[in-house]
Every structure is written in structure tokens, then in C-alpha cells.
């Protein structure tokens, strides 16, 4: 495994791999690797012969009041995990290598990036879209694997690749959960034992929605307050948004139609930690 920090060097390696007809898969992370990230690497390995793991805590997707400076950066541990997962290249550039002093260009994802997470975190998806575009240009992958955990991010990236005619196939990987149903996340380390226990209401809410839709209940608006009550049953959990969307368009959905797929999106403040989760439903 090679660790590369220079974007120009990484791009040259990727171009050489392509010339040698190597199928490249990329997994983009901000480090603090966990089982969810490792599952993305496994998915990439099913298709690609060469795996590039990117580790970059992107300042442009954090608001000034968010946790950029305290975001975990255990690089040596991450490198060990990457090596054990048989990653071929770790691309871990410094911030000034990705955003030079006169850097001016930003990729704006449009309305898709302005709702839900985009509304709660203005500018977040512009930062995501910009860094994903740059990393795709640098690593030159044939496939890129992203987790369903960040469902709106996945939708933004799919739209970006389509709109900008970027020659890469986006692969979705399922959410990895712990034994209590909590979706694994690098930010889970911020949770106290009490907050972690309380946060299981997110999964309980998603499971309740699944049961209701299976009945079938096609009135999605009727399910939302039921899920809200489940989440609020944990006194430390405060919902920011609970919304069903059409999984194809990502537009809010009030009534379900048979044969279509929907996704329930959750954002919850669990004590001091903000958590997001979601589940997909076929009606």
C-alpha cells in the first residue's frame, strides 16, 4: 500500500493505471475509519482491481460553528485499517494542496442540495460537490462507492456526475448498523453511553415506519408524527426533520403509490451530537 499526499502524483498514478487497463475503484472518506467505511472498500473490491482510499477532512463542507477542528483524525490507525483491507493507495492530501491560495471555483448542486441537510447546513453540499468533483478528477476512477447512510449526499453526487458528464459509475452500499441498530458514524465517538442508548429511538422510528408501510399505510404524512413521537420518547433526542421523499427524485412525498420506492429521512439532535439516518421502502 502506498500513501500519496500530492494531487499531481496521485493523478499521474491513476492515469498510468488506466493506461495499463487497471479498473480503479475509489472510496472517499474523512478518515476516522469504521465498519461502514470498510464495507465500502469491500464493495469496491468486488468490482475493481485497484482501490484508492481518500482521506481528507474537507473544511469547505463545515460551517464556522461546526466540528471541523475537533473532527477525529487518527491517521496512523486509519492507515493500518486501510492496509488490512488491502487498499492499494491512500490519498491523504493536506488542505493547502487541495485548496491553493487563489482557489476560486465552487460546484453548486442546485435545489437538490438546498433542502433537508442543505437547509440545516447552508453551503454544506457546495463543499461536498466541490471536493467530490476534485477527487474524481485526481483519482480518475471507473467506480466510486458511497454509503446510503448519507442518502442526500449520494443523491447530490449522482446528479453531479450525470449533469457534468463525469465518466464514473456510482455504487451504493447499504448502511452498517451496530447491534442496537444505530448507524455507524465517525461522530458516534462523541456520544456518551447514555446518549448512545437514547439514540436507538432513530432505528425504532424507522422500523415503525417500515411496519406501517407494510400494512399497507399509503398516507406517509400520517406516519411522520408517529415516528416523531417515538424519537421524542427519549428526552435527550430532538428531531430537526422527519420527511419521506421519492427515492428517485428526492422530492418530499405525502402519499405513497404502489410500485414506487420512498425513503424516510431523519435528522435528530441526540444530546450534544447531531445524527442522521434513513431507510428505503418499496411500496
Curated annotation (Swiss-Prot):
GO CC list: cytosol
Pathway: Cofactor biosynthesis; (R)-pantothenate biosynthesis; (R)-pantothenate from (R)-pantoate and beta-alanine: step 1/1
Entry keywords, A to Z: ATP-binding, Cytoplasm, Ligase, Nucleotide-binding, Pantothenate biosynthesis
Residues the entry annotates as binding (R)-pantoate: 61, 153
Positions of beta-alanine binding: 61
InterPro entries for the chain: Cyt_trans-like, Pantoate_ligase, Pantoate_ligase_C, Rossmann-like_a/b/a_fold
Protein family membership: Belongs to the pantothenate synthetase family.
Task of the protein: Catalyzes the condensation of pantoate with beta-alanine in an ATP-dependent reaction via a pantoyl-adenylate intermediate.
Subunit composition and interactions: Homodimer.
Protein name listed in UniProt: Pantothenate synthetase
Species of provenance: Chlorobium phaeobacteroides (strain DSM 266 / SMG 266 / 2430)
Lineage: Bacteria, Pseudomonadati, Chlorobiota, Chlorobiia, Chlorobiales
Gene: panC
Amino acid at each position: 500500500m502506498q500513501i500519496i499526499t500530492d494531487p499531481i502524483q496521485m493523478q499521474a498514478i491513476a492515469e498510468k493505471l488506466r493506461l495499463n487497463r487497471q479498473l480503479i475503484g475509489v472510496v472517499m472518506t474523512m478518515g476516522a475509519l469504521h465498519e461502514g467505511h470498510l464495507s465500502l472498500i469491500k464493495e469496491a473490491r468486488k468490482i475493481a482491481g485497484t482501490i484508492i482510499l481518500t482521506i481528507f477532512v474537507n473544511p469547505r463542507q463545515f460551517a464556522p460553528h461546526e466540528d471541523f477542528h475537533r473532527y477525529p483524525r487518527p491517521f496512523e490507525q486509519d492507515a493500518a485499517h486501510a492496509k488490512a483491507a488491502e487498499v492499494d493507495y491512500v490519498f491523504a492530501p493536506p488542505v493547502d494542496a487541495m485548496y491553493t491560495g487563489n482557489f476560486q471555483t465552487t460546484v453548486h448542486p442546485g435545489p437538490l442540495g438546498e433542502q433537508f441537510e442543505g437547509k440545516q447546513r447552508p453551503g454544506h453540499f457546495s463543499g461536498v460537490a466541490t471536493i467530490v468533483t476534485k477527487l474524481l478528477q485526481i483519482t480518475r476512477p471507473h467506480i466510486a462507492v458511497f454509503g446510503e447512510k448519507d442518502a442526500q449526499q449520494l443523491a447530490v453526487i449522482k446528479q453531479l456526475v450525470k449533469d457534468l458528464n463525469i465518466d464514473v459509475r456510482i455504487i451504493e452500499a447499504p448502511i452498517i448498523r451496530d447491534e442496537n441498530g444505530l448507524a455507524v458514524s465517525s461522530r458516534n465517538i462523541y456520544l456518551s453511553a447514555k446518549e448512545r442508548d437514547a439514540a436507538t429511538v432513530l432505528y425504532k422510528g424507522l422500523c415503525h415506519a417500515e411496519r406501517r408501510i407494510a400494512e399497507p399505510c399509503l398516507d406517509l404524512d400520517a406516519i411522520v408524527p408517529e415516528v416523531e413521537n417515538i424519537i421524542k420518547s427519549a428526552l435527550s433526542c430532538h428531531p430537526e426533520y422527519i420527511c419521506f421523499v421519492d427515492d428517485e427524485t428526492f422530492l418530499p412525498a405525502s402519499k405513497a403509490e404502489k410500485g414506487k420506492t420512498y425513503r424516510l429521512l431523519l435528522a435528530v439532535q441526540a444530546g450534544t451530537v447531531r445524527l442522521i439516518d434513513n431507510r428505503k421502502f418499496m411500496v
